[in-house]
């Protein structure tokens, strides 16, 4: 399994001959190396409905005939836009031809904001994502605060690689993320959701230096880890 980081919370996984994108915020993302028009993808996994995570999902899904896996309300909202979706919910898992997906809790919000019409559409509960393929498991925490049930994620799953937000303000900051890493007990931890905007500026190298009992790795956009 090859896992690549593409800025903010964008993660690409290549496994079982398929390409999977998590939270494909590409257009308008100053930290990504990807352009939506160049991306080929078989499946898109979404943690929640905020624009900096849904991103280019509709365009990518339609262009590639890709399935979008998302929490129920968000999946329904996207299906009304002509997207092929597979709805799930917290605690549920499903085996796809590209791998197994399980949604975990995340403590955050989830909504679609239409700034032109000044409306906010509720898109269900936010989620973290456990993705398993080729006997390896990747945990993408989505946007979240620190919460004690992260201990359960670590106890019930053998996590090989975890992506944790460290930006603070909208999610947990570096100090809480260090504790999250301890509880999740992943072999390798990569920081995400930082330095995209001034309000979430952090030093990822200071974060990984504080990690204990795991390998911390800062990935620049386009860099990858092979599991």
Curated annotation (Swiss-Prot):
InterPro entries, sorted: Metallo-B-lactamas (IPR001279), RibonucZ/Hydroxyglut_hydro (IPR036866), UPF0173 (IPR022877), UPF0173_UPF0282_UlaG_hydrolase (IPR050114)
Keyword Hydrolase attributed: yes
Source domain of life: Bacteria
SUPFAM superfamilies hit by this protein: Metallo-hydrolase/oxidoreductase
Keywords, ordered alphabetically: Hydrolase
UniProt GO MF annotations: hydrolase activity
Protein family: Belongs to the UPF0173 family.
HAMAP family linked to this entry: UPF0173
Name of the molecule in the record: UPF0173 metal-dependent hydrolase BCB4264_A4722
Biological source species: Bacillus cereus (strain B4264)
């Amino acid at each position: 399994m090859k896992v690549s980081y593409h800025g903010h919370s964008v993660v690409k996984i290549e496994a079982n001959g398929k390409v999977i994108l998590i939270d494909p915020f590409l257009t308008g993302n100053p930290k990504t190396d990807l352009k939506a028009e160049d991306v080929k993808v078989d499946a898109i996994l979404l943690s929640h409905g905020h624009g900096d995570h849904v991103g280019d999902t509709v365009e990518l899904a339609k262009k590639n005939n890709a399935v979008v896996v998302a929490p129920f309300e968000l999946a329904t909202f996207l299906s009304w836009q002509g997207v092929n979706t597979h709805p799930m919910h917290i605690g549920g898992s499903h085996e796809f031809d590209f791998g197994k997906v399980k949604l975990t809790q995340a403590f955050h919000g989830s909504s679609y904001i239409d700034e032109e019409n000044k409306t906010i559409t509720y898109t269900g509960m936010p989620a973290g994502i456990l993705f398993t393929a080729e006997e390896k498991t990747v945990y993408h925490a989505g946007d979240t605060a620190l919460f004690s049930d992260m201990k359960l994620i670590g106890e019930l799953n053998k996590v090989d690689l975890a992506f944790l937000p460290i930006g603070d303000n909208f999610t947990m900051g570096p100090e809480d993320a260090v504790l999250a890493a301890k509880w999740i007990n992943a072999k390798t931890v990569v920081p995400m959701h930082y330095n995209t905007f001034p309000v979430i500026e952090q030093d990822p190298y200071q974060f990984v230096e504080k990690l204990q009992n795991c390998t911390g790795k800062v990935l620049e956009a386009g860099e990858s880890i092979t599991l």
